[in-house]
């Protein structure tokens, strides 16, 4: 395909037009008085959202240079969303301000590489200042306030704080759609996985259709169990102990399954068979998680263990196991606390090293099952459009709350960024590097000014007032008051704020140092086939 090339100022301005088109659509959503954006969908109802990254992903521009500019800013939003789960609009606003100021200086003759170095040093300094000023999140109320701001709804913040209080900071909080109005919180203690009993005959509570085993032994097998002779030696030992048995295997079928069912019906021996969750390597990893949680071992030929020779010492234990037709919950496994912590650390390291969003999500679920519990927030709304928007807001707020617990919080509303600007004086830079630092100083005001503008206030006046206020004091855009924002519950996770700045600066530096852009040449659309006169050939009128 033929290419088109733009150089120098033309290239940079083309990229900037694309950036501005995207940023102008995104920035109207910033702050408590920000508006929504409607996204058309090819099928189904449109999406209404105020989430920066969702809006950015939908924007495709026609002009090839503008398209590249918009794609670069999408990266800012996506990266910020991946790292912190929020702050995508702030990152986009910062990127726009940095590029606007930077290109003005490049056009005036500044050296782009000098500006880039100055920007990088300034961002490093501001990040350091933000981290130093961050306050640890210690109370449920602080989590509720931070999550409430992210969701734009305090009741959502309160529910997320309650969920985190119950399942711990490492616990998984999932959001599901509900058929009812309002919000509900469901909690699961222990490890839960999405596989139920293989046969309905294992049920011990007919009314609830559950099988409940108190203080059972747990047999974990990585292969199928078909013949009863493999199981018999171990079954005899378990029967002598008088405890029930939970079998988790790839599958339990044929003779082995019918023997277990017959003994359960006769009341000779209480047991339940469940299929192991997952597939392939993920199944092996989850079985190993269960083994560590329950203090047992996985019976697998890979480690030289077989059912015929297995001893009762290889079985795991738990205080209670509840099995329904769809899921199994293991409560209070008897595993060694140190071994569980070791496994948690291993999974955390895998999350850090994983490039795949899907793998990371699955690892996060495994981590939660070992370290905490699972909380499910069920969200309902009047229409499907509102439901999708609400669910998305809650998911963002959950990630925001976790980021707050991780690194602490700073004053929200763009105030922390603006009030970190004086720290740049300590850098003592000269020449183009000093100009680069000044570009960052100007850009740090952009989020606050945009929040003020969206709230119907004069941005310059608000910025001047906040600049001369005490640290942490700024505009609460929801009320229009100037107050101590942390005390008023207007806080942002420092992880969100610093990620937004770092990612925006990274893309801005690339913009400024670009000297040529190579893009696909737009193809001319072919003329439609048929008679060019529009008549019907061979017809007399």
Curated annotation (Swiss-Prot):
ATP binds at residues 29-32, 86-90, 413, 476-478, 492. It is found in: Secreted, Capsule; Cell surface; Secreted, Cell wall. The lineage of its organism: Bacteria, Bacillati, Actinomycetota, Actinomycetes, Mycobacteriales. Its EC number is 5.6.1.7. HAMAP family: CH60 (MF_00600). This is Chaperonin GroEL 2. GO terms for molecular function: ATP binding; ATP-dependent protein folding chaperone; isomerase activity; unfolded protein binding. It catalyses: ATP + H2O + a folded polypeptide = ADP + phosphate + an unfolded polypeptide. Together with its co-chaperonin GroES, plays an essential role in assisting protein folding. The GroEL-GroES system forms a nano-cage that allows encapsulation of the non-native substrate proteins and provides a physical environment optimized to promote and accelerate protein folding. It comes from Mycobacterium sp. (strain KMS). One of its GO terms (cellular component) is capsule. The gene is groEL2.
């Amino acid at each position: 395909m033929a290419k088109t090339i733009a150089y120098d100022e033309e290239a940079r301005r083309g990229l900037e037009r694309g950036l501005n088109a995207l940023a102008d659509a995104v920035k109207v959503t910033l702050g408590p008085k920000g508006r929504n954006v409607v996204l058309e969908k090819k099928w189904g109802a449109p999406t209404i959202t105020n989430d920066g990254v969702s809006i950015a992903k939908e924007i495709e521009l026609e002009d090839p240079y503008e398209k590249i500019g918009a794609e670069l800013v999408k990266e800012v939003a996506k990266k910020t969303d991946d790292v912190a789960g929020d702050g995508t609009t702030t990152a986009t606003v910062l990127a726009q301000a940095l590029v606007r100021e930077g290109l003005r200086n490049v056009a005036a003759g500044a050296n782009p590489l000098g500006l880039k170095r100055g920007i990088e040093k300034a961002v490093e300094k501001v990040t350091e200042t933000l981290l130093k000023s961050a306050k640890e999140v210690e109370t449920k109320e602080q989590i509720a306030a931070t999550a409430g701001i992210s969701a734009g709804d305090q009741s959502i913040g309160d529910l997320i704080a309650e969920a985190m209080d119950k399942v711990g900071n490492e616990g998984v909080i999932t959001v599901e759609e509900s058929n009812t109005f309002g919000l509900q919180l469901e909690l699961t203690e222990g490890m839960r996985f999405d596989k139920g009993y293989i046969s309905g005959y294992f049920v011990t509570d007919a009314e609830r259709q559950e099988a409940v085993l108190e203080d059972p032994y747990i047999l974990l097998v990585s292969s199928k169990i078909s013949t009863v002779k493999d199981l018999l030696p171990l079954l005899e030992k378990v029967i002598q102990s008088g405890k029930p048995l939970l079998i988790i295997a790839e599958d339990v079928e044929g003779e082995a399954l019918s023997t277990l069912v017959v003994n359960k019906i006769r009341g000779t021996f209480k047991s339940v068979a469940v299929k192991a969750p997952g597939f392939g390597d993920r199944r092996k990893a989850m079985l190993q998680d269960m083994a560590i949680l329950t203090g047992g071992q996985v019976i697998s030929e890979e480690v030289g263990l077989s059912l015929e020779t297995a001893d009762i010492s290889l079985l795991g234990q738990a205080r209670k196991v509840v099995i329904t037709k769809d899921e199994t919950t293991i409560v209070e496994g008897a595993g060694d606390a140190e071994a569980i912590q070791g496994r948690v650390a291993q999974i955390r390291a895998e999350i850090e090293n994983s490039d795949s969003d899907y793998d990371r999500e699955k690892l996060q679920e495994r981590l939660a099952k070992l370290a905490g519990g699972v909380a499910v927030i069920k969200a309902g709304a009047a229409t499907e459009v509102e439901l999708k928007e609400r669910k998305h807001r809650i998911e963002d707020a959950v990630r925001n709350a976790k980021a707050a617990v991780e690194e602490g919080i700073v004053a929200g509303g763009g105030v922390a960024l603006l009030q970190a600007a004086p720290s740049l004086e300590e850098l003592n830079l000269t020449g183009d590097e000093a100009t680069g630092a000044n570009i960052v100083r100007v850009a740090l005001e952009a989020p606050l000014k945009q929040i003020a503008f969206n709230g119907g206030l004069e941005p310059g006046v608000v910025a001047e007032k906040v600049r001369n206020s005490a640290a942490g004091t700024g505009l609460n855009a929801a009320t229009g008051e100037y107050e101590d924002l942390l005390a008023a519950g207007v806080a942002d996770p420092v992880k969100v704020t610093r990620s937004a700045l770092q990612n925006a600066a990274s893309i801005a530096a690339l913009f400024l140092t670009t000297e040529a852009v190579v893009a696909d040449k737009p193809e001319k659309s072919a003329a439609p086939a048929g008679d060019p006169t529009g008549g019907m050939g061979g017809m007399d009128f």
